[in-house]
Protein backbone atom coordinates (compact mmCIF):
# COMPACT_ATOMS: atom_id res chain seq x y z
CA UNK A 1 0.00 0.00 0.00
CA UNK A 2 1.24 3.52 -0.62
CA UNK A 3 2.20 5.70 2.31
CA UNK A 4 -0.35 8.50 2.39
CA UNK A 5 -2.67 10.38 4.71
CA UNK A 6 -5.61 8.67 2.94
CA UNK A 7 -4.26 5.24 3.94
CA UNK A 8 -3.79 6.43 7.53
CA UNK A 9 -7.40 7.67 7.70
CA UNK A 10 -8.71 4.43 6.21
CA UNK A 11 -6.62 2.40 8.65
CA UNK A 12 -8.04 4.47 11.53
CA UNK A 13 -11.59 3.74 10.33
CA UNK A 14 -10.92 0.00 10.06
CA UNK A 15 -9.32 -0.12 13.51
CA UNK A 16 -12.27 1.86 14.92
CA UNK A 17 -14.75 -0.82 13.81
CA UNK A 18 -12.55 -3.62 15.18
CA UNK A 19 -9.97 -4.55 12.54
CA UNK A 20 -6.43 -5.54 13.38
CA UNK A 21 -4.32 -3.77 10.73
CA UNK A 22 -0.60 -4.32 10.18
CA UNK A 23 1.34 -2.57 7.43
CA UNK A 24 4.79 -4.09 7.06
CA UNK A 25 8.05 -2.33 6.21
CA UNK A 26 7.53 -3.55 2.64
CA UNK A 27 4.11 -1.82 2.63
CA UNK A 28 2.09 -5.03 2.60
CA UNK A 29 -1.19 -4.61 4.47
CA UNK A 30 -2.68 -7.48 6.46
CA UNK A 31 -6.07 -6.99 8.05
CA UNK A 32 -8.41 -9.18 10.09
CA UNK A 33 -11.71 -8.28 11.69
CA UNK A 34 -12.65 -11.16 13.98
CA UNK A 35 -15.22 -9.03 15.84
CA UNK A 36 -16.94 -5.86 14.67
CA UNK A 37 -17.08 -3.49 17.66
CA UNK A 38 -19.36 -0.88 16.13
CA UNK A 39 -21.50 -0.23 13.07
CA UNK A 40 -21.16 3.53 13.37
CA UNK A 41 -18.28 5.48 11.90
CA UNK A 42 -19.65 8.88 12.90
CA UNK A 43 -16.56 9.72 14.96
CA UNK A 44 -14.46 9.58 11.80
CA UNK A 45 -16.78 11.72 9.75
CA UNK A 46 -15.81 13.97 6.92
CA UNK A 47 -12.15 12.95 6.80
CA UNK A 48 -12.62 11.14 3.49
CA UNK A 49 -15.33 9.28 1.56
CA UNK A 50 -14.34 5.80 2.77
CA UNK A 51 -17.19 5.54 5.34
CA UNK A 52 -19.61 5.13 2.42
CA UNK A 53 -17.64 2.07 1.24
CA UNK A 54 -17.91 0.53 4.72
CA UNK A 55 -21.71 0.23 4.40
CA UNK A 56 -21.92 -3.14 2.62
CA UNK A 57 -19.36 -4.97 4.77
CA UNK A 58 -20.88 -3.57 7.98
CA UNK A 59 -24.40 -4.51 6.87
CA UNK A 60 -23.30 -8.08 6.17
CA UNK A 61 -21.63 -8.37 9.56
CA UNK A 62 -24.13 -6.48 11.76
CA UNK A 63 -27.35 -5.91 9.79
CA UNK A 64 -27.14 -2.14 10.26
CA UNK A 65 -24.66 0.70 9.84
CA UNK A 66 -24.48 4.44 10.33
CA UNK A 67 -22.20 6.73 8.37
CA UNK A 68 -21.85 10.52 8.31
CA UNK A 69 -23.41 12.70 5.66
CA UNK A 70 -20.45 13.20 3.38
CA UNK A 71 -19.54 16.55 1.95
CA UNK A 72 -17.64 17.42 -1.18
CA UNK A 73 -13.95 17.03 -1.71
CA UNK A 74 -11.26 18.71 -3.82
CA UNK A 75 -12.98 17.19 -6.88
CA UNK A 76 -16.21 18.97 -5.91
CA UNK A 77 -19.69 17.93 -4.78
CA UNK A 78 -20.27 14.21 -5.28
CA UNK A 79 -23.77 12.98 -4.56
CA UNK A 80 -24.41 9.48 -3.24
CA UNK A 81 -27.72 8.83 -4.98
CA UNK A 82 -26.20 6.10 -7.19
CA UNK A 83 -24.93 4.29 -4.07
CA UNK A 84 -28.33 4.54 -2.37
CA UNK A 85 -30.29 3.40 -5.45
CA UNK A 86 -28.00 0.39 -6.02
CA UNK A 87 -28.10 -0.75 -2.39
CA UNK A 88 -31.89 -0.24 -2.25
CA UNK A 89 -32.24 -2.66 -5.19
CA UNK A 90 -30.20 -5.17 -3.18
CA UNK A 91 -32.58 -5.02 -0.20
CA UNK A 92 -30.86 -2.31 1.86
CA UNK A 93 -33.02 0.40 3.41
CA UNK A 94 -31.22 3.72 3.88
CA UNK A 95 -32.67 6.56 5.92
CA UNK A 96 -31.24 10.07 5.71
CA UNK A 97 -30.98 11.65 9.15
CA UNK A 98 -29.78 15.12 10.11
CA UNK A 99 -26.07 14.27 10.24
CA UNK A 100 -25.99 10.68 9.05
CA UNK A 101 -27.29 7.90 6.88
CA UNK A 102 -28.67 4.91 8.76
CA UNK A 103 -28.76 1.67 6.75
CA UNK A 104 -30.44 -1.60 7.62
CA UNK A 105 -30.69 -4.93 5.81
CA UNK A 106 -31.73 -8.44 6.74
CA UNK A 107 -31.60 -10.13 3.33
CA UNK A 108 -29.10 -8.57 0.96
CA UNK A 109 -29.65 -10.11 -2.45
CA UNK A 110 -28.36 -9.81 -5.99
CA UNK A 111 -29.92 -7.30 -8.35
CA UNK A 112 -29.74 -5.90 -11.85
CA UNK A 113 -28.26 -2.42 -11.52
CA UNK A 114 -27.66 0.14 -14.24
CA UNK A 115 -25.92 3.39 -13.35
CA UNK A 116 -26.86 6.65 -15.08
CA UNK A 117 -23.13 7.20 -15.55
CA UNK A 118 -20.01 5.25 -14.54
CA UNK A 119 -19.20 6.11 -10.92
CA UNK A 120 -16.07 4.72 -9.29
CA UNK A 121 -17.42 5.02 -5.73
CA UNK A 122 -20.86 3.57 -6.52
CA UNK A 123 -19.28 0.71 -8.48
CA UNK A 124 -16.90 -0.07 -5.58
CA UNK A 125 -19.72 0.10 -3.04
CA UNK A 126 -21.97 -2.18 -5.09
CA UNK A 127 -19.18 -4.72 -5.59
CA UNK A 128 -18.28 -4.73 -1.88
CA UNK A 129 -21.94 -5.29 -1.00
CA UNK A 130 -22.62 -7.86 -3.74
CA UNK A 131 -19.74 -10.24 -2.99
CA UNK A 132 -21.54 -11.52 0.11
CA UNK A 133 -25.11 -11.05 -1.14
CA UNK A 134 -27.38 -13.95 -2.00
CA UNK A 135 -27.56 -14.42 -5.78
CA UNK A 136 -26.05 -12.63 -8.76
CA UNK A 137 -25.60 -8.89 -9.17
CA UNK A 138 -25.07 -7.33 -12.59
CA UNK A 139 -23.78 -3.78 -12.83
CA UNK A 140 -24.34 -2.11 -16.20
CA UNK A 141 -22.55 1.15 -17.07
CA UNK A 142 -20.05 0.34 -14.32
CA UNK A 143 -16.81 2.21 -13.81
CA UNK A 144 -13.87 0.12 -15.04
CA UNK A 145 -10.95 2.33 -13.99
CA UNK A 146 -7.74 0.62 -12.82
CA UNK A 147 -8.72 0.89 -9.14
CA UNK A 148 -11.93 -1.05 -9.90
CA UNK A 149 -9.98 -3.77 -11.71
CA UNK A 150 -7.49 -3.90 -8.79
CA UNK A 151 -10.36 -4.27 -6.29
CA UNK A 152 -11.89 -7.08 -8.36
CA UNK A 153 -8.52 -8.84 -8.68
CA UNK A 154 -8.02 -8.66 -4.91
CA UNK A 155 -11.55 -9.89 -4.13
CA UNK A 156 -11.28 -12.74 -6.66
CA UNK A 157 -7.97 -13.67 -5.00
CA UNK A 158 -9.88 -13.88 -1.70
CA UNK A 159 -12.44 -16.27 -3.21
CA UNK A 160 -15.02 -13.96 -4.82
CA UNK A 161 -16.52 -14.71 -8.24
CA UNK A 162 -16.49 -11.50 -10.25
CA UNK A 163 -16.38 -11.24 -14.05
CA UNK A 164 -15.74 -8.02 -15.95
CA UNK A 165 -16.60 -7.06 -19.50
CA UNK A 166 -14.50 -3.88 -19.63
CA UNK A 167 -15.51 -2.76 -23.13
CA UNK A 168 -19.20 -3.20 -22.27
CA UNK A 169 -18.73 -1.60 -18.82
CA UNK A 170 -20.45 -4.58 -17.23
CA UNK A 171 -19.54 -6.38 -14.02
CA UNK A 172 -21.18 -9.60 -12.80
CA UNK A 173 -20.79 -10.63 -9.17
CA UNK A 174 -21.81 -14.04 -7.87
CA UNK A 175 -22.64 -13.71 -4.18
What does each model-found stretch correspond to?
Residues 1-175:
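Structural preference for solvent-exposed beta-strand-turn elements
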